[in-house]
């Protein structure tokens, strides 16, 4: 939840979810 994955999730889900990222405030974060 604190490390930005460099991906937004405004229109599509986080592709980086495969490495543990999740959507938060329209941006993908991990941890």
UniProtKB/Swiss-Prot annotation:
Domain of life: Eukaryota
Location of cross-link Cyclopeptide (Gly-Asn): 1-31
GO biological processes: defense response
Pfam families listed in its UniProt record: Cyclotide (PF03784)
SUPFAM superfamilies: Cyclotides
PTMs per UniProt: This is a cyclic peptide.
Bilayer-spanning residue ranges: none
Keywords in alphabetical order: Disulfide bond, Plant defense
Disulfide bridges in this chain: 5-21, 9-23, 14-28
Function, in words: Probably participates in a plant defense mechanism.
Family to which this protein belongs: Belongs to the cyclotide family. Bracelet subfamily.
Domain notes for this protein: The presence of a 'disulfide through disulfide knot' structurally defines this protein as a knottin.
Protein name per UniProt: Cyclotide vpub-A
Organism of provenance: Viola pubescens
């Amino acid at each position: 939840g604190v490390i930005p994955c460099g991906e937004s999730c405004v229109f599509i889900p986080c592709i980086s979810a495969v490495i543990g990222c999740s959507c938060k405030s329209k941006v993908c974060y991990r941890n």
